[in-house]
Amino acid sequence: MKVLNKDSKRRDEILGIKEWVDMGGIMRIECITIDQMRELIDNDFLDLEDKQNFAPRIKYIYEFMKKYPDFEAHGYAVSPNRDDYRVSIEGVRLKRKATKEEYKEFRLLFEAADEISAVNGEAGLFCWFD
């Protein structure tokens, strides 16, 4: 496993966390853009080989988001006070109707999600891995 950057103040700044609301040592993050993800990777706050349980590895989610930058990731940040300090990516969402190509690739990459909303209506697309 990659050694992650322990500068939690900088990590939280990238993620837009202004005040830490501790829920058992984690903080939910509802919107991680491709730019934020790139900055987290470039500053060693994300390990591209890491994954949330049965989710695709972060590198595959990152490649997907580079190709389709309107998607946003969601997940949580773990407190630097815990041994398992990290940012975990639990899934992605699209807040608009997907193109046929986006929909097809979303279904392929995230088919094993614990929760998936892939009816390509006005609500967009969503997946979550427990």
PLM segments and residue spans:
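Short, flexible beta-strand-to-coil junctions
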Residues: 95-98, 130
